[in-house]
Regions:
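ATP/Mg2+ or Mg2+-diphosphate-binding catalytic cores
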Residues: 267-344
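Active-site activation/catalytic loop segments of kinase-like enzymes and analogous catalytic loops
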Residues: 215-248, 260-283
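A cross-family kinase active-site recognition segment
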Residues: 105-160, 180-181, 210, 283-285
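Juxta-kinase regulatory segment immediately upstream of eukaryotic protein kinase catalytic domains
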Residues: 1-28
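All-alpha amphipathic helical-bundle segments outside canonical DNA-binding/catalytic cores
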Residues: 111, 248-260
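Active-site acidic catalytic loop and adjacent metal/ATP-binding pocket
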Residues: 29-43, 170-216
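ATP-binding pocket architecture of kinase catalytic cores
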Residues: 36, 40-132
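Short Pro/Gly-enriched beta-strand edge/turn motifs at strand-loop
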Residues: 18-25, 61, 168-178
Length: 344
């Protein structure tokens, strides 16, 4: 962002905050980096998150969602008001889940994973008590979107024998075509949750939320390439925390999750490869600090392992398992060799 535009944007945020809260802003920091939409405003006795998005409609949608959800759960930030295009929300904490979980042993990591899954089920349950199902957009509701999701398998063409002929693309698209009956936050990567001073985990950034199957939120979490929990262990967590009131039989729910997560994994892998060619590999610390794409060979291998495991759980996606395995092995070799994918 150009310096002039950045200072103009910051002035708008600070002016709106001082008008709304009737007190001076002492300092402004950028928890996700200065290029992001949200900033932490420091007042004399509190911190507040201010959000100014390029699309003001998403800001107003997010405020609307938070107000509805907060009526029935404490797993999301409190919306503190909207002034023009700027939304203010409670600061849910500086310990982002993606960084917090990397600091603990496997036992504590599993506890955090269980809480992350439980909180998602809770805010989805809260949404069912509201009128959000009548108000929210239906996500991925057209054939073009579903086809685009499945097209991600082209990323596997370079690994192993590529996409085998026995893969039934039509069956995959049919399985992924879902009526929007459940509220989803959408981007539930672990960098979009934080733990506050009260030790409570809360999710934030609801600007892309809408209606779909519901399992997509868990696909974003498990399919976060920087997420350190194995796919096998995450299935155990899903079974343990499953909400029987979500409207689905658990077996059907996990089958849909497996199919969806297979293609979600190819989309994440495609993003990683594109970024690696432009920027080279990044450090794992940078990825976690700025909630960046997992542009590191270890993270690339992780998302391939997620695709390998979940593709094997459904007969629709089982033909892709070998290619995921080959891709995983390829990135493990790159990690050993220290090889770059950056274009000359």
């Amino acid at each position: 962002m150009a310096k002039g535009k950045k200072s103009e944007r910051m002035t708008r945020i600070v002016d709106a905050a001082e008008e709304h809260f009737a007190r001076p802003v002492l300092k402004v920091t950028a928890p996700g980096g200065e290029g992001r939409s949200s900033f932490r405003l420091h007042f004399d006795n509190m911190d507040v998150i201010a959000t100014l998005r390029p699309n003001f409609r998403r800001t107003h949608l997010e405020a609307f969602v938070l107000e509805r959800l907060r009526t029935y759960c404490d797993d999301v930030p409190e919306c503190l008001g909207v002034v023009g295009e700027v939304m203010f929300q409670a600061d849910v904490g500086r310990r982002r889940l993606n960084q917090e979980i990397a600091q603990h042993d496997s036992t504590k990591q599993m506890d955090l994973a269980a809480e992350a899954v439980a909180t998602i089920f809770r805010f989805q349950s809260a949404a069912r008590k509201t009128d959000l199902n009548k108000m929210m957009p239906h996500l991925g509701a057209n054939p073009g979107w579903v086809n685009g999701l499945v097209d991600g398998i082209e990323t596997l063409d370079s690994y192993g024998s590529g996409v085998p002929q026995q893969f039934d693309r039509v069956a995959a698209c049919e399985r992924l075509t879902q009526p929007g009956q459940q509220f989803v936050k959408w981007d539930c990567r672990s960098g979009n949750a934080a733990i506050g001073r009260d030790e409570k985990m809360r999710w934030f950034d609801f600007e892309y939320s809408g209606m779909r199957h519901g399992a997509e939120d868990f696909a974003w979490l498990i399919g976060d390439e920087a997420w350190p929990i194995s796919p096998e262990n995450m299935v155990d967590v899903m079974i343990e925390q499953f909400d029987p009131n979500c409207g689905y039989d658990i077996a059907d729910y996990l089958d849909y999750l497996s199919v969806y997560l297979t293609f979600h994994s190819t989309q994440r892998l495609k993003l990683i490869l594109n970024e690696a060619q432009k920027r080279g590999w990044l450090s794992k610390e940078r990825v976690r600090k700025y909630d960046d794409a997992g542009v590191h060979p270890e993270f690339a291998a992780q998302i391939c392992d997620v695709g390998r495991y979940f593709s094997a759980q459904s007969k629709i996606t089982a033909p892709l398992t070998q290619s995921f395995e080959a891709a995983k092995n390829s990135f493990q070799e790159i990690l050993k060799e220290g090889r770059s994918l950056k274009s000359a």
